[in-house]
Amino acid sequence: MEDINNWEQKFETCIYSDRLVTKLIDLNERTSDKVNIEEVKKAIYYARKYHGSQIRKSGEPYYSHPLEVAFLFAEYSGNENHIIYRTDLIITAILHDTIEDTDLTKDMIEKIFGSLVANNVEDLTRVKLDIKISAGESLNILFTQYKKDILYIKLFDRLHNVRTISYSKTH
């Protein structure tokens, strides 16, 4: 956790982070609610650090997926549903697979980003009580608990997976 105070020195941009940050800057100029770009960059840093060398079936780095989910969520919330255009939810989208797929824990997320983000990321995790549940069950849980704001993140997660499914079927 040595990165908490010096992540900025280690932060590197990439095409995926540039695309997301550019979208957020544009939305911040057009909406009354502003997303904290520095906090988003910190989340990008941790997503890239902890997803590390994981690769998607498309050959892209795995961290491209959560950054694209965050992009889709930002685009929707910034243009259509301003009440959910918030820093904590953009960060949740960026970190949505970290507890499930990396060594980044809920406690670590809480120390870095606070309990709201940590709880949201945990709610998006498909491992419940050491049992992996289906994507459908995960959606149903979020729906029945009326966690609409993070349900949108899960839906954009599924949308991005569907958009990129051709890689897993043909490659």
Can you say where each PLM-predicted feature lies in the sequence?
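Active-site helical microenvironments for divalent-metal-assisted chemistry
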Residues: 1-171
